[in-house]
UniProtKB/Swiss-Prot annotation:
SUPFAM superfamilies in UniProt: EF-Tu/eEF-1alpha/eIF2-gamma C-terminal domain, P-loop containing nucleoside triphosphate hydrolases, Translation proteins
UniProt-recorded name of the protein: Elongation factor 1-alpha
Keyword Protein biosynthesis: yes
Family as reported in the entry's similarity comment: Belongs to the TRAFAC class translation factor GTPase superfamily. Classic translation factor GTPase family. EF-Tu/EF-1A subfamily.
Subcellular localization: Cytoplasm
Region (G2): 75-79
């Protein structure tokens, strides 16, 4: 693939593309990459031929990111794919996330590495994205939980709307998107623009535009945004915590002949260098880095906010084959990461009409680190201005403080130390049922001493005994 040479002097921005299945996320990434020169005409012609062989002629733009046979034959994104895209202002890591409800975990992996979320919604078929079974609202909520503080909303497939109705349809979808975003995300004034990914309209400054669209601007006197390229360049790079101890959650483990295992992920805190003594938790592996790379280019140091690959030297202590996605790399010193079996949490219940009670075991997601998590105790909940101690149930919309026990130890921390390792989503049947953060990670001894939770005891038997005692 012929690409522009990356300018290392430009800051890095990480952008995830999210939205319901068939909204055109991969097509948008493909056409944007082509128009900005990150992929050449010959490569696109190759994708056209491959798409034709799969009887998916209109999907060829998506082949830049949809690389597996399963993705190409089904016409959907399954894994999160990383594409490097240089713009006038940034070197952008584009993370193309799956929209299908069966692959929410993969979407979470992509969103957990991003600074900004690009939400792709179709002008035609918008109702299916926000109706029963639609994943749009869930994606927006998850992106906010995982730290994407800014949104760019692209109303796609505008070319499929009759020309005399495009402005009306765009305004209608924009109003509904504003309503959805205000209810589920921190960014109350997202950039909203119309695009046609397949036709390449409103993607780049030099490309074709919708003449009826007069642009988006944050406030009077600020820049007017017409295209996705301008919307990306309008972003500010979030604060990077290079001065903090190293924390790098692993997103993927690859085995390369002659090299060994490569661990990829984003440096959430601190920096990582070659010849650094590290530990990987909860696997319990200890080793030393041999090389660190960005897009296959060796670096002397990887700063916070970068996605990279890490290779280790020989002589690793521990079972390296047990290292998996969701494990965390840190320096092997007094500030190393620790895996905990449980935590004291503060949570708001959302999207669960019947509420929740002790014993409920949803999936708990800390970015791409996840495990079933049993709500072992509900210590208190807030109803209006009143605090109720030891309630039997927490209703939808109520806040509670409780104790969660993980099925397997997870690397977590307090908000004030590493907030990206403290924020989580509770999920059930691919839907978000709770949003919260860690007040205090708890060791096995703390769970027993402070809360009477014995991890050696069968939780079902304990619950049954407690019920008999109460009776």
């Amino acid at each position: 693939m012929a690409t522009k040479v990356e300018d290392d002097s430009k800051p890095r921005l990480n952008a995830c593309f999210i939205g319901h299945v068939d909204s055109g996320k991969s097509t948008t990434v493909g056409m944007l990459s082509y128009q900005l020169g990150a992929v050449d005409k010959r490569e696109m012609e190759k994708y056209e031929k491959e798409a034709a062989l799969n009887n998916k002629e209109t999907f060829y733009l998506a082949y830049l990111t949809d690389k597996t046979d399963a993705e190409r034959k089904r016409g959907i994104t399954i894994t999160t794919t990383l594409v490097n895209l240089p713009t006038e202002k940034f070197n952008i890591n584009i993370l193309d996330c799956p929209g299908h409800k069966d692959f929410v975990k993969n979407m979470v992996t992509g969103a957990s590495q991003a600074d900004v979320a690009v939400v792709i919604v179709p002008a035609s078929g918008f109702e299916s994205c926000v109706g029963v079974g639609g994943m749009l609202k869930t994606h927006i909520m998850i992106s906010g939980i995982l730290g994407c503080e800014k949104l760019i909303v692209c109303v796609n497939k505008m070319d499929e709307i009759p020309e005399n109705k495009r402005m009306e349809k765009f305004n209608e979808v924009s109003a509904e998107m504003l309503r959805i975003v205000k209810r589920s995300h921190k960014d109350k004034n997202p950039i909203i623009i119309p695009i046609s990914a397949f036709k390449g309209i409103n993607l780049t400054k030099k490309g074709e535009k919708f003449e009826w669209f007069k642009g988006w601007k944050e406030k009077e006197g600020s820049s007017v945004i017409y295209t996705l390229e301008e919307a990306l360049n309008y972003q500010d790079v979030p604060e990077r915590h290079n001065d903090k101890p190293l924390r790098m959650p692993i997103t993927k483990v690859c085995s390369i002949a002659g090299v060994g295992k490569i661990f990829t992920g984003r440096v959430e805190y601190g920096t990582i260098t070659p010849n650094l003594k590290i530990t990987i938790q909860p696997a319990g592996v200890v080793g030393e880095t041999r090389s660190v790379e960005i897009h296959n280019k060796p670096r002397s140091m990887i700063p916070c906010g970068e996605n990279c690959g890490v290779a280790l030297k020989g002589g690793v202590i521990g079972e390296i084959d047990k290292v998996d996605a969701g494990h965390v790399i840190s320096a092997n010193d007094e500030n190393k990461a620790v895996a905990y079996p449980g935590a004291k949490i503060r949570t708001i219940v959302v999207g669960r009409p019947k509420g929740l009670s002790p014993g409920y075991t949803p999936q708990i997601n800390f970015g791409n680190c996840h495990s079933p998590g049993r709500i072992a105790k509900i210590l208190s909940k807030v109803v209006g201005k009143e605090v109720h101690e030891n309630p039997e149930n927490v209703a939808n919309g109520e806040n509670f403080t409780g104790i969660v026990v993980f099925q397997k130890p997870l690397v977590i921390d307090k908000m004030e130390r590493f907030q990206n390792l403290a924020k989580f989503a509770l999920m059930d049947s691919n839907g978000v049922v709770g949003i919260g953060n860690v007040m205090e990670p708890l060791t096995r001894d703390q769970l027993l001493k402070d809360y009477g939770i014995d991890l050696n005891e069968d939780p079902k038997a304990a619950k049954k005994a407690a019920s008999k005692k109460k009776a």
